[in-house]
Amino acid sequence: MAEIRRKLVIVGDGACGKTCLLIVFSKGTFPEVYVPTVFENYVADVEVDGKHVELALWDTAGQEDYDRLRPLSYPDSHVILICFAVDSPDSLDNVQEKWISEVLHFCQGLPIILVGCKKDLRHDPKTIEELNKTSQKPVTPEQGEEVRKKIGAYKYLECSARTNEGVREVFEAATRAALLTKTHKSKKKCSIL
């Protein structure tokens, strides 16, 4: 049993891949049907650097309807994942226009990991065709890294819940970042003001 417990909160636009990422990591199966999330919690045991960590995974709704409810998930967090979809440049724009300000308001000082979800769609012909209709292209790794620098995130990672590529790496990086927060002299926790 893990004696170290950490809390992770995942945020980002609706339908950008947050819930699938959590379900694939915690349960090992990809949900084929999209059901919008209100709030869901999962727990996963993660081992990093010889440490067993019980990671509480707090899923949140990205839709605007839940903007007033979402902050209730932030208190006592140790790490935040801000997600966007590689097949949705608008969701990356929203990282800078919406998500980073919300996270910094409620969770200043916590490590943030920027996650590009749906990496498998970057070279998908149907996705490219759809984006071309609006003169857009899938987000590149370089664009993701550029936004990471702008928002001051700890790390930028990409994954595909559908193919399971990069999923474990996201949560190992998040766990490492969450463990770093305990080494600070003052306890940095999220609070609602």
UniProtKB/Swiss-Prot annotation:
One of its GO terms (molecular function) is GTP binding. It is found in: Cell membrane. Coiled coil: none annotated. GTP binds at residues 12-19, 59-63, 117-120. A motif (Effector region) lies at residues 34-42. InterPro entries: P-loop_NTPase, Small_GTP-bd, Small_GTPase, Small_GTPase_Rho. The modification Cysteine methyl ester is found at C190. Transmembrane segments: none annotated. A lipid is attached at C190 (S-geranylgeranyl cysteine). It is a lipid-anchor. Gene3D superfamilies: P-loop containing nucleotide triphosphate hydrolases. Keywords: Cell membrane, GTP-binding, Lipoprotein, Membrane, Methylation, Nucleotide-binding, Prenylation. Residues 191-193 form a propeptide. GO terms for biological process: actin filament organization; fungal-type cell wall organization; hyphal growth; regulation of actin cytoskeleton organization; signal transduction; small GTPase-mediated signal transduction. NCBIfam families: small_GTP. Has a role in cell polarity, primary and secondary germ tube emergence and cell wall deposition. This is GTP-binding protein rhoA. It comes from Emericella nidulans (strain FGSC A4 / ATCC 38163 / CBS 112.46 / NRRL 194 / M139) (Aspergillus nidulans).
